[in-house]
Curated annotation (Swiss-Prot):
Keyword Disulfide bond among record annotations: no
Main localization (coarse): membrane
Record's GO cellular component terms: plasma membrane
Transmembrane segments: 10-32, 162-184, 189-211, 232-254, 259-276, 288-310, 325-347
NCBIfam families according to UniProt: ComEC_N-term
Chain coiled-coil ranges: none
InterPro entries from the UniProt entry: ComEC_N, Competence_DNA_uptake
Topological type in the membrane: Multi-pass membrane protein
Taxonomy, superkingdom: Bacteria
This protein's record includes keyword Cell membrane: yes
Organism: Aquifex aeolicus (strain VF5)
Subcellular location: Cell membrane
Protein's recorded name: Uncharacterized protein aq_1618
Length: 413
């Protein structure tokens, strides 16, 4: 543990606070076990309904509940005796709730389900405008996911398959990538300083009103806010300190994030990217490949604990970066014009079509790794890998990255 003595004081303090907040969150965010409680709920649909012989089911967000600690949680709703897909996206019901291993399950009969009026906001207005302008199903689905953070559960099967099998499904999940692109594009519309302020205001508006408030968006927006403040005040910016600081705040105010895969995938992806770039000297191509490998390695063990991982994404991500940037650029311009400026919309759809066709081509033979890795195992592996990245320099960082990935290969069923 000699590396601990070499940690800068500021980083040591932030790391310690993060670990303390994690201990608090693991205790405060744990839901008590419940079984067979009939209570009142208001829920909002978070994905598509799935029809089965016994009824229909879908992921939902709990807007209101008689049990206070269930409010604001995501749950899985099963509607019994349903022979059709319920209309609407908001419902009230008296349901049987069961909580097991921090997961919430609600079941109710179809006659106990009542549709509620829709809550329209600026996000809904812009999404409707986008749907009116874009008729192709796959381009519409890509746009709704990329710009507005629509759940990947709402993607058409072919679109989900193409992005999932090539390892680029993260492109359709609003995260730091999207927040960073919005800031980069808006900040270039005005001169320095004014541009950074415009970019920050745009990101705050985008994160607050246009996309779901999921952990990656909150983390990325918080880190960007602190970076802009540091930049405008001519202060030194410590990326690792800010990552741990934002993580500390998120776990303190939203302790249930400590049980969220979304939070940890975002956290470790950014941590590995920052550690890969630390003490690394190389050209732009080398840095792009190392960043892509770092982001992949920082998420692969956790993903492997519940799904397959696709190594081809390490190459596809930097190769497709120009097209992804073009899609974001014309997407932001389309948002600014309320999708009323045809050239930007046409170029946005053209970029999206090219991305989709390239991924469709590679999806049929993209290799997939299915490792038998447990979540606890994945966390230990990621922590050890992060320590290895911190103490190495330059291309020596390939060693800890390689060890993490080789471990996943050795764990293949």
């Amino acid at each position: 543990m000699d590396f601990l003595r070499k940690l800068p004081l500021g980083l040591t303090i932030h790391l310690s606070l993060f670990l303390l907040s994690l201990l608090y969150a693991l205790n405060a965010g744990r839901l008590p076990e419940l079984k067979d409680y009939i209570i009142y709920f208001k829920v909002r649909l978070e994905g598509q309904w799935e029809l089965s012989e016994d009824g229909v089911s879908a992921p939902v967000f709990v807007e209101e509940s008689e049990i206070e600690f269930l409010k604001g949680r995501k749950a899985f709703l099963f509607v019994k005796k349903a022979r059709y897909i319920p209309k609407g996206s908001r419902f009230e019901l008296f349901g049987n709730v069961r909580v097991k291993k921090n997961r919430v399950f609600i079941s109710a009969y179809i006659w106990d389900l009542e549709r509620l009026p829709e809550k329209k906001n600026i996000r809904d207005f812009l999404m409707e405008k986008f749907k009116e302008k874009v008729k192709d199903e796959h381009l519409r689905a890509i746009g709704l996911a990329f710009l507005f953070g629509e759940s990947k559960r709402n993607l058409p099967a072919e679109v989900e398959r193409v992005f999932l099998h090539t390892g680029l499904i993260h492109v359709l999940v609003v995260s730091g990538l999207h927040v960073g692109l919005v800031f980069l594009i808006l900040s270039r519309l005005l001169p320095r300083f004014y541009g950074e302020v415009l970019g920050l205001v745009g990101v705050l508006f985008y994160s607050a009103f246009l996309v779901p408030h999921n952990p990656p968006v909150i983390r990325a927006t918080s880190m960007l806010f602190l970076w802009v403040l540091s930049f405008l005040s001519f202060r030194r910016y410590c990326s690792l300190c800010v990552l741990f600081f934002t993580g500390t705040l998120m776990l303190f105010f939203f302790p249930h994030f400590s049980y969220s895969y979304s939070f940890w995938l975002s956290f470790f992806a950014v941590l590995y990217i920052l550690l890969v770039l630390k003490d690394f000297e190389g050209g732009n191509t080398s840095k792009a490949l190392m960043v892509s490998l770092g982001a992949f390695t920082g998420t692969a063990p956790l993903i492997a604990s519940f799904s397959f991982v696709t190594p081809l994404s390490v190459l596809l991500t930097p190769v497709l970066s120009p097209l992804i940037f073009a899609y974001a650029l014309f997407g932001v311009l389309s948002l600014l014009t309320l999708f009323s400026f045809p050239p930007s919309l046409i170029l946005m759809n053209l970029s999206g079509e090219l991305i989709f066709r390239v991924l469709e081509f590679f999806s049929d033979f993209s290799p997939k790794i299915l490792s038998n890795v447990k979540p606890e195992e994945a966390f230990i592996l990621l922590i050890l890998g992060a320590i290895g990245l911190y103490v190495t320099k330059g291309y020596s960082k390939l060693l800890p990255l390689g060890v993490v990935n080789l471990y996943l290969i050795f764990k293949i069923n």
